[in-house]
């Protein structure tokens, strides 16, 4: 998947994430699908595996191609307070121990179990980039399926150690997967990277 499409799918998670009332998620999904079609991105939302934290997309021509995107911090959303608490933990170097981040990992694994993609790509912005990194680093199930991942200004702490404690096997597996960390110069959230 090209970087622009990956970034657009990460951006679209915010459209779904901003819904404060759960029953309005289908309207947000319709808006996202329309936007993706207008942008010429051949993916659509998988409603049953999309919530306010993680959006799942499938290729319209080949449903075995799946893209999972983790949402970043979104003030004013129903997840906003959890997002901010996670951000504070990231700033203190404790992001990998955050419940919100760990739940995203478990949900991602459930999505993979349910959809069993032939091709899996992933993306995330800010907090979503950090939770994506955690998920990839800590989940063998994800690494076994993952073809590519892009993070955009992934959350990190410039004051504390951000390293994931990875097994030697995980480190070896990660060398085989193209994971690109895109960072905007002077972005304070990702400064630790």
Question: Model-found features: residue ranges?
Answer:
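A conserved cap/lid and substrate-binding interface adjacent to the catalytic center
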Residues: 13, 18-122, 140-148, 155-159, ...
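Gly/Ala-rich beta-loop-alpha elbow adjacent to hydrolase catalytic centers
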Residues: 124-128, 132
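Catalytic metal-binding/acid-base residues of hydrolase active sites
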Residues: 127, 153-155
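Extracytoplasmic/secreted cell-surface and envelope-processing proteins
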Residues: 131-132, 158-161, 191
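Short glycine-enriched nucleophile-adjacent loop
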Residues: 132-140
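Alpha/beta-hydrolase-fold catalytic nucleophile elbow
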Residues: 152-153, 183
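A catalytic-pocket lid/entrance helix-loop region that shapes and gates access to the active site
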Residues: 168-178
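Acidic catalytic loop of the alpha/beta-hydrolase fold
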Residues: 184-192
């Amino acid at each position: 998947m090209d970087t622009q499409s990956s970034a657009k799918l990460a951006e679209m998670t915010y459209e779904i994430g901003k819904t404060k009332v759960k029953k309005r998620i289908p309207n947000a999904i319709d808006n996202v699908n329309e936007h993706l079609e207008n942008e010429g991105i051949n993916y659509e939302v998988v409603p049953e595996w999309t919530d306010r934290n993680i959006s799942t997309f499938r290729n319209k021509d080949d449903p075995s191609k799946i893209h999972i995107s983790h949402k970043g911090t979104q003030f004013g959303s129903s997840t906003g307070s959890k997002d901010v608490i996670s951000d504070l933990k990231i700033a203190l170097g404790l992001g990998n121990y955050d419940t919100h981040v760990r739940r995203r990992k478990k949900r991602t694994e459930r999505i993979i179990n349910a959809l069993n993609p032939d091709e899996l790509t992933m993306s995330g912005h800010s907090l979503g980039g950090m939770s994506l990194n955690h998920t990839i680093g800590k989940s063998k199930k994800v690494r076994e399926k993952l073809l590519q991942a892009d993070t955009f200004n992934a959350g990190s702490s410039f004051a504390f150690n951000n390293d994931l404690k990875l097994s030697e096997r995980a480190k070896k597996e990660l060398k085989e997967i193209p994971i690109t960390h895109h960072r905007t110069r002077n972005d304070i959230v990702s400064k630790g990277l």
